[in-house]
């Protein structure tokens, strides 16, 4: 239940900032901050400084930021595709995220936990942190500023491209 609270409150409280401050900086900030907080949590964990309650509290804070960033990134990812392929793009992105985040990651973390070595679990934290920071940096470098723009301004529909000019499907 506490993790769900972090997941819920993050988008509710930070959501408006993604349209006022901008999606690109906010997605980058929330991803990089989540990664940094996960490293700090991992360090405390491997040193034996966390209890079940304090590690849960750390995760709630991490989920607060990560969920807000992921929610906006999901929307942004769907906006950058032309209308004609947007639904398929969303489906593929969602399926890939579910495969990695819902199936592969829990399996790998389960294997790390079974070793009963905090250092191995910490390694899993580092991999997760690296991926979050990489996502934030990727957004900074190649993200699209889509706030306060219509979907057609972000991604021109394929049907709007002129036929025969070589800039769209024939």
State each model region's role.
Residues 1-170:
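Transmembrane-helix signature of 12-pass secondary carriers
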């Amino acid at each position: 239940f506490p993790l769900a609270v972090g997941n819920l409150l993050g988008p509710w409280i930070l959501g408006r900032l993604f349209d006022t401050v901008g999606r690109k900086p906010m997605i980058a900030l929330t991803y990089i901050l989540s990664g940094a907080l996960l490293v700090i949590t991992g360090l405390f964990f491997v040193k034996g400084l966390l209890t079940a309650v304090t590690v849960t509290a750390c995760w709630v804070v991490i989920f607060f930021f990560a969920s807000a960033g992921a929610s906006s990134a999901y929307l942004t990812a769907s906006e950058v595709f032309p209308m004609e392929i947007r639904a398929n793009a969303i489906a593929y992105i969602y399926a890939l995220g579910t495969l990695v985040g819902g199936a592969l990651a829990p399996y790998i973390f389960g294997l790390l936990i079974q070793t009963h070595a905090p250092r191995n679990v910490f390694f899993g934290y580092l991999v997760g942190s690296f991926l979050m920071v990489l996502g934030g940096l990727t957004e900074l470098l190649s993200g699209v500023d889509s706030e306060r723009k219509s979907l057609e301004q972000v991604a021109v529909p394929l049907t709007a491209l002129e036929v025969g000019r070589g800039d769209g499907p024939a």
